[in-house]
From Swiss-Prot:
Domain notes: There are 3 rolling circle replication (RCR) motifs. RCR-2 is probably involved in metal coordination. RCR-3 is required for phosphodiester bond cleavage for initiation of RCR.
Motif stretch (RCR-1): 24-27
Active-site residues annotated for this sequence: Y106
Provenance organism: Sugarcane streak virus (isolate South Africa) (SSV)
Alphabetic keyword roster: ATP-binding, Covalent protein-DNA linkage, DNA replication, DNA-binding, Endonuclease, Helicase, Host nucleus, Hydrolase, Metal-binding, Multifunctional enzyme, Nuclease, Nucleotide-binding, Nucleotidyltransferase, Repressor, Transferase
Segments for region (Oligomerization): 180-192
Region (Transactivation): 257-275
Assigned protein family: Belongs to the geminiviridae Rep protein family.
Short sequence motif Nuclear localization signal: positions: 297-308
Domain CRESS-DNA virus Rep endonuclease intervals: 17-120
Protein name: Replication-associated protein
Amino acid sequence: MSTVGSTVSSTPSRRFKHRNVNTFLTYSRCPLEPEAVGLHIWSLIAHWTPVYVLSVRETHEDGGYHIHVLAQSAKPVYTTDSGFFDIDGFHPNIQSAKSANKVRAYAMKNPVTYWERGTFIPRKTSFLGDSTEPNSKKQSKDDIVRDIIEHSTNKQEYLSMIQKALPYEWATKLQYFEYSANKLFPDIQEIYTSPFPQSTPALLDPTAINTWLENNLYQQNSNSNRKLSLYILGPTRTGKSSWARSLGRHNYWQNNVDWSSYDEDAEYNIIDDIPFKYCPCWKQLIGCQKDYIVNPKYGKRKKVASKSIPTIVLANEDEDWLRDMTPAQQDYFNANCETYMLEPGERFFSLPAVSATAHPSSEV
């Protein structure tokens, strides 16, 4: 049985994320046999050690069939591909089943036929332990956190469970739990959409910018030479940020550099309105270096930049990086970065054409 769309692409499917040991799927108007669907799902989640799969056919009001599937695994099934569970062109509604008991009861409320394999794991009455039972064994903190990791479905739920189960640790070590939450449930990078209509930059020397783009951004597979970064200095309201952000997938930093959300799949970086003295690892960024160590705030030191990508630095005249550098720093900067200084009237967008029939303003 074929699986449709099982590869991650650069389409909006990047925004999807599923992570849970209990997965609830509903295939609407699906004529496939429950056994065939169940066997396919069992095979599909083999990497996460399936322990139970229930596949139920239900009659819909219009006379067609739905297929409900409850899949339980020893390890959380994780995917960022919205088409991961597609079967022969049928795309399911995908949910994290917080209560496996309720989901199973719902799926079995009026079955036409069903198929199941493995041993159903009822939801624990409390995976934090029941201290009211005299012979109950108190869970260790490691067991508690392990259960929270397996059962939480998002960052907020994870932190809420930690707060409830380990209030003292939550109060005294919150920054570490926030760090682990970001690692377990990383933010999905949103595709930037410019709020302005597409237009041609009104530059005195567009060839300089176009040449930099061609040599350093558009030739992604060229590894013969290390790329050069780009420094753009000019007034505000000239469209620098919108233009730079519209070029492709990127890491964007404004006011400060936040390494915790570094996107390894980004094609370039943008440093927007950050003074030179407050930019960490500026040599690594400007020099398009790879595999360097950074120190995220409240997080552990880590290695980033598995590939060489250029950085676009955007600055206004009052925060000119070159003015704040030593001669040695300027030498390194100029050797690794193209510079474009906007002249009066230059901008990274074109003004709309004025109609010949437009009436002149009566304002004085």
